């Protein structure tokens, strides 16, 4: 089994995790990033997705992050998330409803140019990506 290392995961409003893990999988900007003890130092941006922490006993904890940064050192990793939540805390029904509304707003052709919709299009797409990532974190947590 891998050597444990210290991990801190914080968002502007709270600290979500502080403890030892043997592995982290995080959603880096250009793909999933797997971290073990003694990883080479790096800093990367995170995109919306799930952070999976594997503890020494094999238990996996799943968190959702909306984006942020990860700093990796040989014996510790710090994740600074824009927004974050434990997958167990997320309300699946509320997220599904919000996702359906966002998809409808993005896809609904009404035949007229809707300048308000055009201004908010990018924001709606970002929200849709975040909602989809939250649902994926919930599903992973249930496994």
Swiss-Prot record:
Organism superkingdom: Bacteria
Predominant localisation class = membrane
Q: GO CC annotations?
A: plasma membrane; proton-transporting ATP synthase complex
Q: Where in the cell is it found?
A: Cell inner membrane
The topology of this chain with respect to the membrane is: Peripheral membrane protein
Alphabetically, the GO molecular function entries are: ATP binding; proton-transporting ATP synthase activity, rotational mechanism
Q: Which UniProt keywords apply?
A: ATP synthesis, Cell inner membrane, Cell membrane, CF(1), Hydrogen ion transport, Ion transport, Membrane, Transport
Family annotation (Pfam families): ATP-synt_DE_N
Signal peptide limits:
none
> What HAMAP family does the entry give?
ATP_synth_epsil_bac
Q: Which family does it belong to?
A: Belongs to the ATPase epsilon chain family.
Quaternary structure and interacting proteins, as annotated: F-type ATPases have 2 components, CF(1) - the catalytic core - and CF(0) - the membrane proton channel. CF(1) has five subunits: alpha(3), beta(3), gamma(1), delta(1), epsilon(1). CF(0) has three main subunits: a, b and c.
Main function: Produces ATP from ADP in the presence of a proton gradient across the membrane.
- Descriptive protein name: ATP synthase epsilon chain
């Amino acid at each position: 089994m891998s050597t444990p290392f210290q991990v801190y995961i914080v968002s502007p409003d709270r600290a979500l995790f502080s403890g030892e893990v043997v592995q982290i999988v995080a959603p880096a900007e250009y793909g999933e990033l797997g971290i073990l003890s003694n990883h080479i130092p790096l800093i990367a941006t995170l995109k919306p997705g799930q952070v999976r922490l594997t503890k020494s006993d094999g238990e996996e904890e799943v968190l959702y992050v909306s984006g942020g940064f990860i700093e990796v050192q040989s014996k510790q990793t710090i994740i600074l998330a824009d927004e974050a939540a434990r997958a167990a805390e997320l309300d699946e029904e509320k997220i599904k409803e919000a996702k359906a509304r966002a998809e409808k707003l993005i896809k609904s052709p009404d035949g007229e140019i809707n300048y308000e919709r055009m201004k908010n299009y990018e924001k709606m797409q970002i929200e849709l990506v975040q909602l989809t990532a939250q649902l994926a974190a919930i599903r992973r947590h249930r496994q």
